[in-house]
């Protein structure tokens, strides 16, 4: 097989979205390299997508960009690829973390999926006083992250961190990173913005001068943060309290809304 594969229609060459399957594989990628497929990826290509030997796929590993590849062999026992040309150089996503209090399983999965699609670099479950469910099925969430990245043209996977108590997170917080605290109304809605008890600014306004500074978004549990947690958060210099509008949002909706606002204000949607 020649090192170059003629793969028309790839984004970045003709500007047209390719219809070739796209896979994340945890292996080095270079022209002519052999790339083994996991059992799950082989099943997906051969049995779901109905691809066979000689067919073209796109692959990425989060380090070496995106490459075209051909299915070199396919059988019931598995499949393997031969890597061709690089179709896109490696690009990162903005330095944005999403931190959220775990909710019910399907909602947590939705948050993780949408955070991947919307370009979060780090996803971290945070256990608060009112967190209703702190069970995290990391293997299942990693599979969701992989599939979402494959479908949305990401060139990397966000880091999924293990869950940690909010108190520990705040104690070890990096000084250079802003924490965008989604606190809908504050304790006193008539008080001036900011301080220990005032309401937060609308998120887009609060982020207007943030620029490219590293940031994290904190989404609370369905029951909200406790008074002690909110007081602690508002006492920290690196915390920016914000509101997401006049309506009370579900946790998963708040995460999607906050990520969208941040990307359009400070991220790679600009």
Each model region followed by its residue ranges:
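Short gly/pro/ser/thr-enriched loop/turn and capping motifs at secondary-structure boundaries
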Residues: 131-133, 188, 248-251
